[in-house]
């Protein structure tokens, strides 16, 4: 009998003023505080993209941060979430900034 909570994975892309405002560093800190794993990186088109994995309620907390909070100097216009699915195990051991 397993009491493990289901794990979720979701991809995201954040639009707005999200580069040059320490967004990735704050995202990494927030993910570690919440307890999710995955990654974040800048794109060549001025957005921030990545993936979040963890228990559903923690992933939902990170989704809220990515769409409403961000770093202090950022301005989030919108956040697109895609490929949301249930996973059997985490694919990452931590949350990291990619370059």
Curated annotation (Swiss-Prot):
Keyword Transcription: no
Residues of the active site: 24, 42
Highest taxon of source: Eukaryota
Species this protein is from: Equus caballus
Name of the protein in its database record: Acylphosphatase-2
Protein family (similarity comment): Belongs to the acylphosphatase family.
Annotated positions of the Phosphoserine modification: 93
Modified residues (N-acetylserine): 2
Gene3D superfamilies referenced in this protein's UniProt entry, alphabetically: 3.30.70.100
Keyword entries, A-Z: Acetylation, Glutathionylation, Hydrolase, Phosphoprotein
Gene: ACYP2
Catalytic activity: an acyl phosphate + H2O = a carboxylate + phosphate + H(+)
Gene Ontology MF annotations: acylphosphatase activity
Modified residues (S-glutathionyl cysteine): 22
Free-text function comment from the UniProt entry: Its physiological role is not yet clear.
Keyword Phosphoprotein: yes
EC number assigned by the record: 3.6.1.7
Record-annotated Acylphosphatase-like domain positions: 9-99
